[in-house]
C-alpha cells in the first residue's frame, strides 16, 4: 500500500469526474473489490489483508445492498486502508449496527473520508454556487444515498 499522501493524491485525481468511480479508485490503490451475494443484510462490508499479496488488501461488500450503499461501503473500506492499515490485521468487518469492533473515532474518521471521497467539497460547492441544492438531485448526480448527501450538506433530520 502506498503512503497516505500518495493515496490522497490518487483519490483527488479520481474526484475530477463525478460520480467518483469508486471501484476504479480502489483498484488504482491496489485494492481488489469483491461483491458477496449471500451475506446477511446487517453486514455491509469488510476489508482484510490479502494473504496472497504482500501488503495488499481486499474489500468485500454486500451485493444485496443498494448501489449507493455499496459505493459508500467501498469508500469506507478504502478509508480504513488509507487511514488505519495498521489496525486491519485479519480484517475489519462493518455491520449496520456495530459498524465494527473499532473505536467510534476510527469509524467516524473512515466515514468522513468516505464522504470526502464520494462527495468532494469542491465539486459539491460548485454545484451549490450554481443553485443546485436539492438533496435528491445532488445525491443522484454523486450516486450516494439521500441520507448521505443530507448529512454532507448539514441538513439531515
Regions found by a protein language model. Name each.
Residues 1-157:
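Active-site hotspot residues in diverse enzymes, especially metal/ion-binding acidic/histidine motifs
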Amino acid at each position: 500500500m502506498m503512503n497516505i499522501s500518495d493515496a490522497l493524491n490518487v483519490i483527488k485525481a479520481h474526484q475530477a469526474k463525478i460520480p467518483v468511480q469508486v471501484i476504479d479508485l480502489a483498484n488504482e490503490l491496489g485494492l481488489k473489490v469483491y461483491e458477496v451475494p449471500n451475506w446477511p443484510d446487517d453486514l455491509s462490508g469488510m476489508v482484510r489483508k490479502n494473504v496472497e499479496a504482500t501488503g495488499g488488501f481486499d474489500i468485500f461488500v454486500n451485493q444485496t445492498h443498494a448501489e449507493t450503499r455499496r459505493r459508500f461501503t467501498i469508500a469506507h473500506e478504502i478509508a480504513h486502508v488509507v487511514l488505519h492499515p495498521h489496525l486491519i490485521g485479519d480484517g475489519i468487518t462493518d455491520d449496520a449496527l456495530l459498524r465494527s469492533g473499532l473505536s467510534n473515532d476510527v469509524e467516524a474518521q473512515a466515514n468522513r473520508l468516505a464522504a470526502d471521497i464520494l462527495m468532494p467539497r469542491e465539486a459539491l460547492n460548485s454545484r451549490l454556487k450554481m443553485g443546485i441544492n436539492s438533496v435528491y438531485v445532488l445525491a443522484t448526480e454523486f450516486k450516494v444515498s439521500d441520507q448521505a448527501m443530507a448529512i454532507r450538506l448539514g441538513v439531515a433530520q
